[in-house]
Amino acid sequence: MREFVGHGIGKEMHEDPQVPNYGKRGYGPLMKRGLCIAIEPMITLGDRQVIMERDGWTVRTRDRKCAAHFEHTVAVGAGEADILSSFKFIEEVLGDKAI
């Protein structure tokens, strides 16, 4: 699923840099202190080719196998990144049913 990438986030929802979910370490955009990015890993059990549905929003894999998308927003710091997004509320609502 290489058509979709993580991205910078700030005044606008989607900003540079684009952050691919694939590649070689050390070859992507430079992550500078203060940069906020949305990291959006995607996995599929089958083909990485995708089809965009007519509604302009829904995406599925060409072979219709299961796929998943997850997102975290992080701020690049001097050491470790700070995770700005939290899914704690999902765990609180779902309790034992949370994955």
Model-derived regions: residue spans:
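Short, basic/aromatic beta-hairpin or loop at an interaction surface
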Residues: 4-19
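Charged, cofactor-coupling segments
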Residues: 23-99
